[in-house]
Amino acid sequence: PGEELDYFLIGGESLEEVLVNYTDLTGKPALPPAKTFGLWLSTSFTTTYDEETVTSFIDGMAERDIPLQMFHFDCFWMKEYQWTDFEWDLDQFPDPPAMLKRLASRGLGLCCWINPYISQKSKLFDIGMEKGYFIKNPDGSVFQTDLWQPGMAIVDFTNPEAAKWFAAGVRKLCEMGVTAIKTDFGERIPTKDVVYYDGSDPYKMHNYYTRSEEHTSEL
């Protein structure tokens, strides 16, 4: 026989009721802070930027009388190929707390990009290897791939200690003044020949992994 596909039919007397019934199954989303409904500005696809660049972007919006509520720091707030280590590139951002405080004083919410893939150049790589915080191969070795960064490992959020470890990095950013987190990726997850800490089915984890990442960032 070929592959199977499961369907879930969720009904209701109206579209509103269908949505209520659907979220009964998936969970009810929390209402985001009001600021997040405003205009966002991102450094996405800007591969080299520093504090001066960020300030020029924000000043440019003000000069054009375009109201701005959120500013997002994409990949390169960290050093290239050290994703994710939760460490600012101090060559480009010498004093991150002071910068964040200055930007917040302008009424901006501040967002940083992260992902659960740990580069071999990241300071977190050796820690995760030693403590068993990464998804593993069936032989017990750490699963590594070159799909995003050379030899990267993937955080195993089914391990409670690994989840706490990753969440500590998120908390560090928030305590510094970051008010939102972009939890990127999570979709490039191996669906066979890997082992999770809690024995989860890798095939099913393909869809559940991103929820685990999001939940961890809320810890």
Please tell me what each predicted stretch does:
Residues 1-5, 214-219:
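Short intrinsically disordered, low-complexity coil segments enriched in acidic
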Residues 1-69, 100-102:
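Carbohydrate-recognition beta-sandwich/jelly-roll modules
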Residues 67-217:
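Aromatic- and carboxylate-enriched substrate-binding clefts and catalytic-loop regions
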